[in-house]
Swiss-Prot record:
<comment type="function">
    <text>Binds as a heterodimer with protein bS6 to the central domain of the 16S rRNA, where it helps stabilize the platform of the 30S subunit.</text>
</comment>
<dbReference type="GO" id="GO:0003735">
    <property type="term" value="F:structural constituent of ribosome"/>
</dbReference>
<comment type="subunit">
    <text>Part of the 30S ribosomal subunit. Forms a tight heterodimer with protein bS6.</text>
</comment>
<dbReference type="GO" id="GO:0070181">
    <property type="term" value="F:small ribosomal subunit rRNA binding"/>
</dbReference>
<keyword id="KW-0689">Ribosomal protein</keyword>
<keyword id="KW-0687">Ribonucleoprotein</keyword>
<dbReference type="InterPro" id="IPR036870">
    <property type="entry name" value="Ribosomal_bS18_sf"/>
</dbReference>
<dbReference type="InterPro" id="IPR001648">
    <property type="entry name" value="Ribosomal_bS18"/>
</dbReference>
<keyword id="KW-0694">RNA-binding</keyword>
<protein>
    <recommendedName>
        <fullName>Small ribosomal subunit protein bS18</fullName>
    </recommendedName>
</protein>
<dbReference type="GO" id="GO:0006412">
    <property type="term" value="P:translation"/>
</dbReference>
<dbReference type="GO" id="GO:0022627">
    <property type="term" value="C:cytosolic small ribosomal subunit"/>
</dbReference>
<dbReference type="Pfam" id="PF01084">
    <property type="entry name" value="Ribosomal_S18"/>
</dbReference>
<keyword id="KW-0699">rRNA-binding</keyword>
<dbReference type="InterPro" id="IPR018275">
    <property type="entry name" value="Ribosomal_bS18_CS"/>
</dbReference>
<comment type="similarity">
    <text>Belongs to the bacterial ribosomal protein bS18 family.</text>
</comment>
Length: 79
């Protein structure tokens, strides 16, 4: 039997590098909403394509924005 060919995953482009964003601020709600699901959960970095350091900064900024009521803790809910 022939060995199955492995597909190489397509590398994700970093959305922060593409938009030339260097500073992640908790007051930039429009940017932070791109990294939150419709349920209000923080998206994983394998989904968003950011680096480990950027993911940490994004997560901290989202948590700070939630604390000062700029972002909700949860999404719209079930219905």
């Amino acid at each position: 039997m022939a060995k199955a060919e492995l597909r190489k995953p397509k590398p994700k482009s970093n959305p922060l590098k593409a938009a030339d964003i260097t500073v992640i601020d908790y007051k930039d709600v429009a940017l932070l909403r791109k990294f939150i699901s419709d349920r209000g959960k923080i998206r994983a970095r394998r989904v968003t394509g950011v680096t480990v350091q950027e993911q940490r900064k994004i997560a901290q900024a989202i948590k700070n924005a939630r604390e000062v009521a700029l972002l909700p803790y949860s999404g719209a809910g079930r219905g």
